[in-house]
Amino acid sequence: MLRIAGERHAALLAGDIGSAQEMALIAAEAPERLMADILLVPHHGSKTSSSGAFLDAVSPQVAIFQVGYRNRYGHPHPQVWQRYGARDIERLRTDAAGAVVIETGGDALEVRTARSMRPRYWSSALEVAALADATEAPADAQP
């Protein structure tokens, strides 16, 4: 796990930690050392990560799910995806958005995605808008 902090914002790159490691971090670290505006979601959003306690401790504004298109593991897990949504955390999936660029000049975060910045010429305006949003639930998510 790596936390990168500037004057106003921080990013937490969680790697492949699971809920047991999340709980150990919560117990061992001062709360301000876990808080981050940007979270690279632990273990691609698997069902063994992103516990509610961890999300509450980190309290991110933006969560990036690093997942491959039609990955064989089904990441992110629908319950994990919903857990982030229930906390009003902006969710981005790299399989839908491509690369994610976040600029932190000032108090606000500016989030852009590769597919919204460089749409394919054959894409319609509606497809580009859907990709730019990239907050769609996984296909197997339950409402």
Residue ranges and their predicted role:
Residues 1-76:
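Active-site-proximal loop/helix segments of hydrolase catalytic cores
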Residues 69-143:
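Binuclear metal-ion centers of metallo-dependent hydrolases, dominated by the metallo-beta-lactamase
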